[in-house]
């Protein structure tokens, strides 16, 4: 996981990240959907790039289907966990610490993914456009780019100015949100059990809501096009209560390779 503007995020709790996320994310279903998309589009299974890879859940599952996997994130601690997972699965791979808005990998990829609303962490519009340009420059002509977002509805109505909490034997957290316009700031306080005591640490995360139409205009400007959109990686109707949209993106054949 990474943010568009450099920011220390997801560093202190990389080792408990999977436990916190597991209840809300069905990685296997999401990854199988992406693999099915590749098969249906006859995508070559040579090079796979996972952006804002976090602890490598996408990388280590989808990467089994590709000859080589590259996992990118800004958090060294997340990359360390991802690297362990990739090696454990026997996947030919490397991890790279880079900002997804300014990629410089000197190769192109058949599949690029950016999951778990990492695109929403890109707050500035110019950085968002740079992100899509970077993807376009690293995507092969017949390749596919799959990313997902938290919708405007989720950010403004579900997250909004609300508070949440999580309480298990080893981990407790309190999550307070503040919504200002299109941007939600999420302050999280964690208490993680270590021996007989709980260690506290704090994280602040910021996401921005983007309309589908604005995202599509940025994608087009970067020389790509929207092939289809999925409701949380499922072929269901997208409506005003949809919380997550996955975009399936291809190079626009009408545009020159950038």
Regions found by a protein language model. Give the residues of each.
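Conserved class I S-adenosyl-L-methionine
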Residues: 2-44
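Class I SAM-dependent methyltransferase SAM/SAH-binding core
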Residues: 49, 56-102
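A short acidic, Gly/Pro-enriched loop at the edge of an enzyme's catalytic core
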Residues: 104-111
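Residues lining the SAM
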Residues: 115-117
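A short His-aromatic
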Residues: 120-122
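SAM-dependent methyltransferase
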Residues: 126, 146-216
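A short glycine-rich, Lys/Arg-flanked "PGG" loop and its adjoining helix->strand segment in the class I
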Residues: 129-141
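C-terminal lobe and adjacent flexible extensions of AdoMet/dcAdoMet transferase-like proteins
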Residues: 212-258
């Amino acid at each position: 996981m990474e943010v568009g503007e450099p920011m220390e995020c997801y560093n202190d709790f990389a080792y408990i990240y999977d436990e916190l996320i597991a209840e809300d994310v069905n990685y296997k279903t999401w990854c199988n959907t992406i693999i099915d998309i590749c098969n249906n589009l006859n995508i070559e299974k040579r090079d796979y790039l996972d952006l804002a890879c976090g602890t490598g859940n996408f990388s280590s599952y989808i990467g089994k289907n590709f000859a080589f996997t590259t996992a990118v994130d800004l958090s060294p601690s997340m990359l360390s966990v991802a690297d362990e997972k990739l090696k454990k699965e026997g996947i030919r791979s490397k991890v790279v610490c880079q900002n997804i808005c300014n990629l410089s990998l000197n190769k192109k990829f058949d599949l690029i993914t950016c999951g778990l609303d990492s695109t929403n962490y890109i707050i500035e519009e110019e950085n968002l456009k740079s992100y899509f340009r970077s993807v376009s420059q690293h995507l092969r002509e017949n390749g596919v780019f799959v990313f997902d977002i938290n919708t405007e509805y989720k950010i403004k109505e579900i997250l909004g100015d609300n508070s949440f909490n999580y309480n298990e034997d080893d981990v407790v957290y309190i999550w307070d949100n503040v919504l200002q316009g299109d941007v939600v700031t999420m302050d999280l306080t964690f208490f993680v059990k270590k021996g007989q005591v709980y260690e506290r640490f704090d994280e602040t995360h910021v996401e921005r809501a983007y309309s589908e139409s604005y995202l599509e205009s940025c994608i087009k400007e970067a020389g790509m096009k929207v092939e289809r959109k999925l409701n949380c990686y499922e072929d269901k109707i997208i409506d005003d209560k949809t919380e997550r949209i996955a975009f399936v993106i291809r190079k626009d054949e009408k545009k020159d390779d950038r």
